[in-house]
């Protein structure tokens, strides 16, 4: 699902409820124990669904936003400025090759205090100037998010390492998430919280960058 329709975002909350219930059923977590969620994303739909699920009461600690080299979301969480004025990079995780993250608007609306006028102004700035900046007050509401990205080289190394360690081949999008999770652990020291890494793309369904150039 790559739609920006609100109904699709709402449906995706079930992924995280199911994952939490599965962990609890298998005895991996205790009742009400918080987990982290790592989501590889460009359009912000799946991680927004996790955010909604958290706000509805699902025990989620950190929402870890994983980007590829089109790291507009990482830069947003790092600086508070969303800026699409940059080169577009074709990567091996093409479903994340996005510079205008359409579902982020819904998060902006929430942290703007459900202020439609303020939200509209920022989206108009994005349309005309290619960027907008949120206020410090709005940034403070993003404390539950962590953002980072992986390069193409790092993504390939993650796939290789996981295959050598487990015999399991992950797709490039999931590898981005796994690589970012490693960075999260190093940056925060949080190695104890149980963590779900969302796999949002099938291994054999996405075209390579070369395929995209030829299409």
Annotate each language-model stretch with its function.
Residues 11-26, 31-34, 110-188:
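Active-site-adjacent helical/loop segments in soluble small-molecule enzymes
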Residues 7-14, 99:
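A glycine-rich, Thr/Ser-enriched phosphate-binding loop motif common to dinucleotide/cofactor-binding enzymes
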Residues 1-6, 10, 204-215:
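Single conserved hydrophobic/aromatic residue that forms the stacking wall/gate
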Residues 11, 39, 65-66, 168-172, ...:
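General beta-strand structural signal in soluble alpha/beta enzymes
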Residues 28-31, 36-125, 200-206:
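Glycine-rich phosphate/pyrophosphate-binding loop at beta-loop-alpha junctions
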Residues 61, 68, 179-206, 210:
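Catalytic phosphate/nucleotide-handling subdomain of diverse soluble enzymes
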